[in-house]
């Protein structure tokens, strides 16, 4: 096995297995259920699924139109967290739901997985543990640059819509 660290701090491990024609790629991060806030257990696992669904380009039909809606949703969640009145919280929650449905009409569900599978990837999956989360698949060696680009995009430009959350 070869191990090295990139300038950005990313650790890379390469193990050649000449008996296999495909490459097994895995991206892991040091975050898991230990990082869940006490009141939101399961959040790391939920984020694993969210990160699997799309980016500003993968699964987004019109990110220029979607992005302001997501920013408004985030602002509404912040507003709801600060609101003490239960009736006002409920009204904000309804606004969030309406915005989420509106945004959901602008995205494609499962586009990330479909894109990976279209390049020959198999076993596209992920897992969340106590202190780490990973995403992996096997793919034809000639697709390594495409796999690296697609895999990096989920961390660089994640985007989530209502249709992604339902999937």
Predicted regions and their residues:
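Short coil/turn segments at secondary-structure boundaries
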Residues: 127-131, 162-165
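His/Glu-rich zincin catalytic helix
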Residues: 1-107, 134-159, 166
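Catalytic zinc-binding patch centered on the HExxH motif and its immediate surroundings
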Residues: 16, 124-128
């Amino acid at each position: 096995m070869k191990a090295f660290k990139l300038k950005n701090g990313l650790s890379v491990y390469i193990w050649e297995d000449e008996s296999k024609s495909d490459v097994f790629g895995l991206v892991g991060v040091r975050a898991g259920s230990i990082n869940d806030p006490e009141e939101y257990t399961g959040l790391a696992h939920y984020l694993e699924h969210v990160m699997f669904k799309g980016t500003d380009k993968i699964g987004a039909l019109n990110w220029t139109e979607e992005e302001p809606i997501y920013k408004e949703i985030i602002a509404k969640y912040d507003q709801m967290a600060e609101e003490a009145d239960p009736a006002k919280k409920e009204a904000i929650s309804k606004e969030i739901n309406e915005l989420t449905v509106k945004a959901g009409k602008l995205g494609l569900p499962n586009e990330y997985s479909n894109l990976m599978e279209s390049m020959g990837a198999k076993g596209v999956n992920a897992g969340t543990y106590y202190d780490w989360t990973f995403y992996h698949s096997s793919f034809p060696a000639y697709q390594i640059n495409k796999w690296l680009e697609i895999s990096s995009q989920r961390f660089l430009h994640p985007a989530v819509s209502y249709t992604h959350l339902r999937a």
